[in-house]
């Protein structure tokens, strides 16, 4: 089993600085949600991370089985919805996540 760690702290309003090892990235909310729109939002980052995992695994699989790929693109789309109210809060969850894969 491997343990991964990340640290997240507020930079300004809804802009967050995310750190893991020697790497840093920003996450933010769009202007209409009160952010500064200087980076993708956390939901987009989660979809991107899932897509990156799938893409990396596809390249590993192709290499292991001698499949000559020119390129492969994963387009991720997720539908967000609220659960039942818990302690006056509506937690959001993915109701569905879809992946469109284009292979070249």
PLM feature spans:
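Extended beta-strand/beta-hairpin segments
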Residues: 1-48, 59-104
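Alpha-helical metal-binding/catalytic segments enriched in His/Glu/Asp
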Residues: 50-54
């Amino acid at each position: 089993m491997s343990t991964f760690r990340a640290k997240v702290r507020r930079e300004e309003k809804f802009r967050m600085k995310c750190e893991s090892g020697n790497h840093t990235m920003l996450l933010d909310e769009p202007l209409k949600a009160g952010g500064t729109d200087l980076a993708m939002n956390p939901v987009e980052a989660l979809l991107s991370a899932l897509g990156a995992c799938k893409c990396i695994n596809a390249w590993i699989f192709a290499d292991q089985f001698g499949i000559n790929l020119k390129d492969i693109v994963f387009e991720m789309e997720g539908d967000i919805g609220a659960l039942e109210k818990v302690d006056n809060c509506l937690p959001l969850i993915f109701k569905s996540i879809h992946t469109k894969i284009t292979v070249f």
